[in-house]
Amino acid sequence: MSQKQQTMKTIIAEKPSVAKEIAHIVGADKREEGYMQGNGYYVTWVFGHLVQPAMPETYGMKGFHAENLPVIPDPFVLVPRQVKTENGYKPDAGVLAQIKIIGKLFDSSERIIVATDAGREGELIFRYLYTYLGCRKPFDRLWISSLTDTAIREGLQNLRDGKEYDNLYHAAKARSEADWLVGINGTQALTIAAGRGTYSVGRVQTPTLGMVCERYWEHKRFESKPFWQVHFGVVDADSGNILKFTSANRWTDKATATDIYNKVKETGSAIITKVATKRKVEKAPLLYDLTTLQKEANSQHGFTAEHTLSIAQKLYEAKFITYPRTSSRYISDDVFATLPKLFKNLENHSEYGEKVKLLPGSEDYSKNSVNAAKVTDHHALLITENAAIGLFKDEKIVYDMILCRMIEAFSADCIKDITSVSAQVDHEVEFGISGSIIRQTGWRALSLKEKNKRQDKDADATDNEVKEQVIPNWQEGQHITLSGCTITEGKTKPKPLHTESTLLAAMETAGKEIEDDTMRQAMKDSGIGTPATRAAIIETLLKREYMVRQQKKLVPTEKGLALHSVVKNMAIANVEMTGKWEAELAKIERGEASADGFTHSIEGYTREITAELLGCDRLFSHKDSGCQCPKCKQGTMQFFGKVVRCSNKECGMPVFKQVAGKLLTDSDITDLLTKGKTRTLNGFTSKQGKSFSAAIAFDENFNTKFVFAEHKTAEKRGNVKRYKK
C-alpha cells in the first residue's frame, strides 16, 4: 500500500470478478494480494460472508444439552467465517487473510465505497465486516441495477450516503439473528427430544417442508372417483366443422349417464337456451421478478430454482441482464424511457430482430409494468444494452425468456370475444359449448407460454383458456340437429404433488392460492423466504434428505414426513406466522417498524418453540429390536415408527421400513439385521408403477439394495432410502 501520501478510497465488492470490473472503470490497474490499486483507489472484495454470528460454543455451550436452551445471545458475537473440523468449528484461513487485508485498506483510506450487491444480504455482508473490524470511516453506497460500464460510471457519479441504508441493514441483521435463534435452538431441542440423529429445523425451511408434506398426504389420501359425461356434435353449416357440446353435469352413476345418453341419442335434436358473448381484454403480462422467472423456467424447461438463479447471476455478472435477485415486476418511468433505444438496437439482430418488430410504436407501449411505487430495491428483470454473445444453451434459454417477456410486457393487450352457448335436450338436460375469436393478438403474438406448451403437459399446469373456434350465429329458441352422441368416463384427480414451480408460488403467498399476478405482487411481503433465499431453502431440504426430486415432483422422504408429523401443529411449522415475520422485516426495511420490537418478539417465539420441541420426546417413542447394529457392532437397533436406528450416537445407522411402497414387517427387519438379507418379498412398486418382487440386503457400506431372484442386484435409487456415512 504505497500510496499513503495520496488520499485514498477503498471500494469493496462482493466478488473478485465484480471488483475487477470496477477497478477497470476507476483506473485501479495494479494488482496486489487481495486487492487492486491505482488512481486514488483501493478495490478489494469479499467472497460471501467473511464474518458471521458465532456458534453456541463461543458462548461456552458445547454439545446439545436441554439445560442450555434456549441460547439467546445478548449481544450476538461476530466471528470470522468458520469451517467445521473434527475438533469443532475453526476460522477459515483464507477468510482470516482477506479480513486482515481489508482492515489495512480501511485504515489507509479516507472513505469507503460499498459495492457489495445492492440488496439486503449484500448490505449485511459489508456491515458485519465493518462492525467486526471496529471501523469508523465514513462510507458511501454504490447502488446499481446492472454491471455495465455505463451503470457503474453513473453509479460512481451518484453515490449515496451509506446511512440511507441503515434500515436495510437493520432488517438484514434482524433476519440473520432470527434465523440463528430459531435454527440453533429448534434443531438442538428436537434432536435432544429425538434421542438420536440430528433433526434440523428452521424459521423458513420447516414451514416450507410442511407445505410439501401436506400436499403429499392430500394427494396420497385422495380417493379418485369415476364420473361420466355425455357429449353431442353439431355440424357448422358454414365451415363443415363438428362442434362439440358437453353436458353441464358430471354423473357419478354410470346407469344414470347411460340413460341420458340414450335419451339424447333418441331425441336427435336440442334447443338453444342461451347465447352470450363478452369481450375479454388480456393485459400484457408483468415483467419477471426472480421468483416468477424461476417458476416458469421450472415448468417450461425443468430447471431447478437454484439452477435458474445461478444462470441469472452469471448473466448479470456478464453484463447481459440487470440485477437478478429482485422482488419487483415493475419499472419506473425513467427506466421505461430507455426502452425504445434498447429495442431499436435489436432490430437488426439475426434472431431477435423479427421478435422486436412485433412491438407497437414506442408511444403505444403498454405501461402495465410501469409503476415507480411498486419498484423495491431493484426494478424488474431486463436485458441490458450489451449484446449477449457466447452463451451456453441454458444461459441462452434464460436470456431469451427475459427478453421475450420484455417484448410481451410492452406489447398491446390481447383482445378476445368469447361466446358461450347453452342448449337443452328434451327441455331437461343442459349442455354447453364455448369458443373464442381473437380480435387483437397483441402480446400473445410472442407468447412463450403458447409456443412452449408441451404435448406431455405438466400435471401442475392449468389451462383455463377457452378453445379458439368460431361459434355459429345461433339464436335463443333455435333448434339444432345433433350429429353423433358419445359418453365418456373420467376420474376426479387430486391436487398434484408440488413441483419447484408450485412450491415457489406457495412460498410467495404463504400457502394461499392466488392466480392473479397483481394480487400475488401485493402479497409478496407476506410470503415466506425472499426471492434471493427461496432456492437455497429448497436445496437445504433436499440436502438434509427431508425430500427428494422424482422427475419434476418434490416428494417428502420418510425422514421429512416423520419430522412433519412431530412438528406440524407447533409454532415452528406455522406458515402464516412465518409470513408475518417476513412482512415485519419488510416494514423494518421501509422504516415503518422497529428492529428491537421484532427481535423481542422473535426471542419470545424462540422460547415457545424450544419448549414445544423439548416436550415432544413422547412422540419419538421406541422399542428395542434385540439386534446388534451390523455396522458399528456397538449399539442396538431400535424401532422408531417407520425407522429402525442404531442407538450408538456416533453411528446412528438408519434402516427405513418403507421401501418402494411396501412396509417391511418387524420380522423382515430382524432377518435383515441378523442375516444381512430378507427373504424374497412381494409388493414392491417401481417408479413406473409396476409391481415387483425382491429381497432386501445390505451392501458393503450398509446401504440397502434389492436382490432379485436371478441373483442380479440393482440399486433402486429414490425407492430405497440410502444411509450415507
Segments predicted by a language model, with ranges:
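Metal- or metallocofactor-binding catalytic centers and their adjacent structured scaffolds
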Residues: 252-286, 294
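Basic, low-complexity terminal or inter-domain segments flanking catalytic cores
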Residues: 2, 6-10, 32, 88, ...
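C-terminal or mid-to-C-terminal helical accessory/interaction module adjacent to the motor/catalytic core
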Residues: 94, 107, 149-232, 277-278
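Intrinsically disordered, low-complexity regulatory segments
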Residues: 2-176, 180, 186, 451-454, ...
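Conserved short loop/turn motifs at secondary-structure junctions
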Residues: 7-8, 116-118, 195-198, 277-286, ...
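Amphipathic alpha-helical transducer elements in NTP-driven molecular machines
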Residues: 16-23, 40-43, 47, 66-69, ...
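Structural motif
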Residues: 116-120, 168-173, 196-204, 221-223, ...
